[in-house]
């Protein structure tokens, strides 16, 4: 497999690709993934023994309840009760990590009551993607692997295996029809090869304007991608400020996501970046989102000479020197998570409270005396929640307790992972175990799904970053309930539309055979 056959963001080697399967070739369809899925930027682990237990329990419980409700297993698992069943199975295997009770799984009305509880919750997804209509790189189809191997998709086989999976129509369905997402930030990525740009800066803004005009409300916001060290890169910054007027900037300090790139750079490069910060602040576009962490297992070789640019050792000084600039660190800088075994990562944390690269990020506010550094959860929440929920709770808990609940923002990296609804449900239900709280000396629990901490993470922190008046959010949510997207969603559901549970990525090959649900 050549580099140009590889999907977006993929940094794994040819041998590592040979160890993976397409999700739509190898998976039990579950509301929540039952094994780790990668978007290609890191290596997926084989299904663990505990994940196999979870899958077995989901099947067993779902078969029983589906029969009782005169439904097929697949139909049952597409309901809210099916989602609750998956969380019950996870709690049986991992301990009580998620807030759920048996009534939700057994009683479709009880599951509906929970859904009503969260109606109108403001959820701002700080990292979403789709591709332009004329994108021709078929290698992107490798991302289809996630859903089935992760066991999440009742109907993925009904979606043609074409690039349409990643285009705008399916994006709108997955994000706004099949999840509780209120507002989405549309992102992109730079590549040394211009053919691999997913969306141009113009396309990002045009998409946002089109959707918002159709909706009659602000449902989408957009980045402009910056490319430090590219020839004449500041000319594009000037054009974006004058013509495009993005809400924030996005870039990769490693340069090209395929790496290694001749355009790798640092946030604290005074000659290169400080003139940009000055210009951005003057223009009132003072938030920059930076890909950090999330590297493949062989990052030291694959990104030789540039991998250190994916660490956070350039964040503190830049944030201190530019207090008016907001630095949103995508993937919370988590290194190639679970590069070996899940229990090794958790054992390391239990021993010394350290999570590679992410803890370095969490310590920046206190170490540098800054309050303008944020952690974003795209991809890393999804992969940790389904592989080791206890680790996930420690990971999120550390960010909340060291950085503060005002400095953690929600993101899912969808549409690569399909509908983000299961991630939303997992975050609503997740709590930090008391023994971790006590040992780490933490004071802040995650709390209720609509409590102060989770409401901040889900949307209020990003509302502040992107200049949406937080005091008007409640009123805005009511307007979202009556805009065109809300009307389309109501009609979609009334006609029997249901979440496909599709996701598009990579799973590890571990002897699985395709199962029809």
Show the residue positions of the predicted features.
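Divalent metal-dependent hydrolysis catalytic cores, especially in the metallo-beta-lactamase
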Residues: 126, 145-164, 173-196, 219-225, ...
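Catalytic pocket-lining loop regions of alpha/beta-barrel enzymes
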Residues: 140, 258, 263-410, 418, ...
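Mid-to-C-terminal alpha-helical segments outside catalytic/metal-binding sites
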Residues: 71-88, 111-113, 138, 152-174, ...
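Hydrophobic faces of well-ordered beta-strands that scaffold small-molecule active sites
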Residues: 124-128, 184-186, 220-224, 249-250, ...
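Active-site gating/metal-coordination segments in enzymes
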Residues: 190-310
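N-terminal secretory signal peptides
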Residues: 1-71
């Amino acid at each position: 497999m050549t580099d140009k056959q590889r999907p977006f963001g993929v940094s794994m080697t040819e041998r590592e690709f040979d160890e993976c399967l397409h999700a739509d070739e190898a998976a039990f369809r579950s509301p929540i993934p039952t094994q780790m899925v990668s978007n290609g930027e890191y290596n997926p682990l084989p299904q663990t023994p505990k994940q196999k237990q979870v899958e077995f329990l989901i099947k067993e419980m779902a078969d029983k309840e589906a029969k009782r409700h005169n439904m097929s297993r697949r139909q049952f698992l597409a309901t809210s009760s099916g989602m609750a069943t998956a969380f019950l199975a996870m709690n049986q295997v991992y301990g009580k990590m998620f807030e759920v009770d048996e009534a939700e799984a057994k009683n479709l009305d009880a599951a509906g009551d929970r859904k009503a509880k969260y109606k109108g919750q403001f959820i701002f997804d700080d990292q979403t993607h789709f591709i332009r209509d004329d994108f021709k790189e078929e290698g992107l189809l490798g991302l289809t692997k996630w859903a089935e191997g992760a066991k999440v998709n009742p109907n993925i086989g009904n979606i043609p295996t074409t690039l349409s999976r990643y285009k705008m129509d399916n994006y709108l369905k997955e994000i706004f029809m099949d999840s509780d997402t209120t507002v989405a930030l549309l992102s992109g990525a730079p590549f040394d090869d211009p053919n691999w740009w997913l969306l141009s800066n113009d396309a990002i803004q045009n998409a946002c304007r089109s959707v918002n005009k159709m909706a009659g409300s602000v449902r989408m916001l957009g980045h402009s991608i910056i490319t430090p060290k590219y020839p004449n890169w500041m000319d594009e910054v000037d054009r974006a400020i004058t013509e495009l007027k993005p809400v924030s900037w996005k870039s990769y300090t490693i340069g090209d996501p395929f790496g290694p790139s001749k355009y790798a750079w640092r946030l604290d490069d005074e000659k290169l970046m400080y003139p940009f910060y000055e210009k951005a602040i003057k223009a009132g576009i003072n938030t920059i989102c930076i890909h950090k962490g999330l590297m493949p297992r062989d990052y030291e070789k694959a990104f030789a000479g540039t991998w250190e640019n994916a660490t956070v050792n350039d964040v503190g000084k830049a944030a201190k020197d530019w207090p008016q600039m907001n630095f949103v660190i995508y993937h919370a800088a988590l290194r190639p998570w679970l590069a070996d075994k899940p229990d090794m990562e958790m054992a390391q944390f239990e021993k010394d409270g350290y999570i590679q690269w992410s803890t370095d990020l969490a310590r920046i506010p206190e170490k540098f005396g800054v309050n303008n550094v944020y952690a974003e959860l795209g991809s890393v929440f999804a992969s940790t929640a389904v592989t080791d929920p206890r680790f996930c709770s420690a990971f999120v808990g550390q960010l909340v307790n060291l950085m503060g609940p005002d400095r953690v923002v929600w993101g899912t990296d969808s549409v690569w992972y399909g509908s983000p609804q299961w991630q939303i449900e997992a975050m609503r239900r997740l709590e930090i175990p008391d023994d971790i709280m006590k040992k780490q000396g933490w004071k802040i629990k995650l709390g209720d799904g609509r409590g102060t901490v989770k409401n901040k993470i889900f949307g209020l922190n990003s509302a502040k970053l992107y200049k949406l008046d937080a005091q008007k959010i409640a009123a805005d949510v009511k307007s979202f309930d009556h805009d065109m997207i809300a009307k389309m969603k109501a009609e979609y559901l009334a006609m029997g539309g249901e979440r496909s549970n599709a996701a598009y990525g990579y799973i590890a090959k571990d002897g699985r055979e395709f199962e029809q649900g």
